């Protein structure tokens, strides 16, 4: 899972949760 090793993906996921 490259997403776990990608800080950008993690940041994007956090923004997605905050945008909810």
UniProtKB/Swiss-Prot annotation:
GO CC term (a single one):
cytoplasm
Q: What is its main location?
A: cytoplasm
Provide this UniProt record's keywords sorted from A to Z.
Answer: Cytoplasm
Where on the tree of life does the source sit, at the highest rank? Answer: Bacteria
Subcellular location, in the record's words?
Cytoplasm
UniProt keyword Cytoplasm present:
yes
Claim: Cytoplasm is one of the keywords in the record: yes
Similarity field? Belongs to the RecX family.
According to its UniProt entry, the function of this protein is described as: Modulates RecA activity.
Q: Give the protein name, as stated in the record.
A: Regulatory protein RecX
> Source species, please?
Azotobacter vinelandii
